[in-house]
C-alpha cells in the first residue's frame, strides 16, 4: 500500500479512505489481488514487483509513461506477460509510452515508431515496419544484422558487422560519418518521407540515401 499510495500522498490527492480505494483499483488494474495490499515487497516475485511499479506509475493518471528497460531483468515468459499488460493498459487508458529498450524483439512487439540512438544522438527514426524492412543508417543496419536467427547452422558474421558499421560515429561511411575534426560537414536529420528520418550530411539527397 505504501509504495503505490506515495504519489497520491506527495500530491495531496484525496483522503486516506480515497487512497485505499484507489490503490485497490490500481492493483486490480495491473492484475494483482487487492488482498496483497499489506504484503511486504520481498514477498513478491519479479513480475509482481514490476506490476506494482506500473500501478504506482499510474496512480496520478498520466497520459505519458517513460518505460526504461521495463522487462530486461525478467524471465522471457514474465516479459511477455508484462508487455501484454502494457499493451492492454495502453488500449484501456489511452496511454502513450516512451519505451527504452536494447531488445529489438521487444521493440518490434511494443513500438509504433522507433528512434535509434548511438553515442547520445538520434541516428534514425521511422515507423516500426519501415525501420525493420528498410533501415538506412549503417548503425541501424548493424543492430538488425546482429540479431541472431534461431538456426544453429547460421552463424553470425561478426567481421561483416564491424565493417564501417561500428558504434563509433567516426568509422561510419560517408555521408553518415561524424568526425570531430571536420568543421565543415554539417550533420543533421534528413527527411526521407513517410515520417522516416536519418542523420547524415545535410547535403546528401534523400533519394541517394534510400537507394
Can you say where each PLM-predicted feature lies in the sequence?
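Hydrophobic anchor residue at the start of the ABC signature
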Residues: 54, 82
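Conserved ABC ATPase signature
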Residues: 40-44, 48
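Charged, flexible cofactor/metal-binding loops and thiol motifs
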Residues: 34, 128-210
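A short, proline-enriched helix->beta-strand linker immediately N-terminal to the Walker B motif
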Residues: 59-63
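A short, surface-exposed alpha-helical micro-motif characterized by mixed small hydrophobic
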Residues: 107-109
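Conserved ABC ATPase "signature" region
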Residues: 18-35, 144
Amino acid at each position: 500500500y505504501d509504495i503505490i499510495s506515495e504519489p497520491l500522498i506527495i500530491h495531496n490527492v484525496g483522503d486516506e479512505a480515497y487512497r485505499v480505494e484507489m490503490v485497490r483499483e490500481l492493483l486490480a488494474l495491473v492484475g494483482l489481488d487487492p488482498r496483497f495490499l499489506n504484503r511486504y515487497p520481498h514477498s513478491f516475485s519479479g513480475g509482481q514487483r514490476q506490476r506494482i511499479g506500473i500501478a504506482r506509475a499510474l496512480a496520478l493518471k498520466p497520459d505519458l509513461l517513460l518505460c526504461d528497460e521495463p522487462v530486461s531483468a525478467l524471465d522471457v515468459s514474465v516479459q511477455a506477460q508484462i508487455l501484454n499488460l502494457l499493451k492492454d493498459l495502453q488500449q484501456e487508458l489511452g496511454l502513450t509510452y516512451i519505451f527504452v529498450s536494447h531488445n529489438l524483439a521487444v521493440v518490434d512487439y511494443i513500438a509504433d515508431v522507433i528512434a535509434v540512438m548511438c553515442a547520445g544522438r538520434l541516428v534514425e527514426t521511422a515507423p516500426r515496419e519501415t525501420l525493420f524492412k528498410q533501415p538506412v543508417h549503417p548503425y541501424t543496419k548493424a543492430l538488425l544484422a546482429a540479431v541472431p536467427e534461431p538456426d544453429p547452422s547460421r552463424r553470425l558474421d561478426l567481421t561483416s558487422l564491424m565493417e564501417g558499421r561500428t558504434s563509433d560515429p567516426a568509422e561510419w561511411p560517408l555521408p553518415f560519418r561524424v568526425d570531430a575534426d571536420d568543421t565543415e560537414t554539417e550533420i543533421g536529420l534528413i527527411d526521407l518521407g513517410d515520417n522516416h528520418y536519418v542523420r547524415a550530411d545535410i547535403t546528401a539527397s534523400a533519394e541517394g540515401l534510400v537507394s
